[in-house]
Amino acid sequence: MSEKKVERVLTGTVVSNNRNKTIAVLIERKVRHPIYKKYIKRSTKVHAHDEKNKCALGDLVRVVEAKPFSKTKHWALLEVVEKSVFVD
């Protein structure tokens, strides 16, 4: 009875890449208010493992749930969906 575990995949924006092989990804979702029925933005920040340090600030990335890399890092970079364009 080997059941395949379903992996969670999230899409978000890189908000920090200051640490070596680690990125912080902001995941935004919309939830409906139970009383007022208005959609509200909610966000979660997760830390993900970036083995090759290829992410930059503002990149749209896809992360997948993985084994714990450290105390707060439980996600791994799956792919860079869209590179950001920053103009100084």
From Swiss-Prot:
Q: Which family does the record assign?
A: Belongs to the universal ribosomal protein uS17 family.
Pfam families attached here?
Answer: Ribosomal_S17 (PF00366)
The record's section on SUPFAM superfamilies has:
Nucleic acid-binding proteins
Please provide the Gene Ontology terms (biological process) for this protein.
translation
InterPro entries cross-referenced by the UniProt entry: NA-bd_OB-fold, Ribosomal_uS17, Ribosomal_uS17_bact/chlr
Task: Could you list this entry's UniProt keywords, alphabetically sorted.
Answer: Ribonucleoprotein, Ribosomal protein, RNA-binding, rRNA-binding
What this protein is reported to do is described as: One of the primary rRNA binding proteins, it binds specifically to the 5'-end of 16S ribosomal RNA.
What is the name of the gene encoding this protein?
rpsQ
UniProt xrefs under CDD domains: Ribosomal_uS17
A GO molecular function for this record?
structural constituent of ribosome
Q: Name one GO cellular component term.
A: cytosolic small ribosomal subunit
On subunit structure and binding partners, the annotation says:
Part of the 30S ribosomal subunit.
- In Swiss-Prot or TrEMBL terms, this protein is called Small ribosomal subunit protein uS17
Superkingdom, taxonomy of origin: Bacteria
Write down the species: Ruthia magnifica subsp. Calyptogena magnifica
